[in-house]
Amino acid sequence: MSESLVVCDVAEDLVEKLRKFRFRKETHNAAIIMKIDKDKRLVVLDEELEGVSPDELKDELPERQPRFIVYSYKYQHDDGRVSYPLCFIFSSPLGCKPEQQMMYAGSKNKLVQTAELTKVFEIRNTEDLTEEWLREKLGFFH
């Protein structure tokens, strides 16, 4: 393998936005979608969404380009309790350019550590991002 693994830094304004997002008080679903600026080698904000379901979020993701998502999800437990887990979702669709995938894969752990997240999931097809999929993944934590 001739290419070395590139680990991109996280843009300072994005670090602050993630910190604020972590402590938000709103009770609806919300997402921060991030991408890599390959020229600057930085993880930057792509889009911020409020009141978005997993199915609506899926429609915002490019089908052929990787993205990082931090998603605040209103999780209704079977016993009636409600929690708001923060999920990190790495969307790495099949058919992405290999160098792009390597750059995202190499930067994922640094971003997860920066955002201090523990619920980390990956999808290889944007169509997989559904409410059912997310509830199943979160079921392991609750």
Curated annotation (Swiss-Prot):
Signal peptide (UniProt feature, chain positions): none
GO CC list: cortical actin cytoskeleton
Alphabetized InterPro entries for the sequence: ADF-H, ADF-H/Gelsolin-like_dom_sf, GMF
Name this polypeptide is given: Glia maturation factor beta
Boundaries of every ADF-H domain copy: 4-139
Post-translational modification remark: Phosphorylated; stimulated by phorbol ester.
Modified residues (N-acetylserine): S2
Family matches, as SUPFAM superfamilies: Actin depolymerizing proteins (SSF55753)
GO BP terms, alphabetized: actin filament debranching; learning; locomotory behavior; negative regulation of Arp2/3 complex-mediated actin nucleation
PROSITE patterns for this protein: ADF_H (PS51263)
Superkingdom assignment: Eukaryota
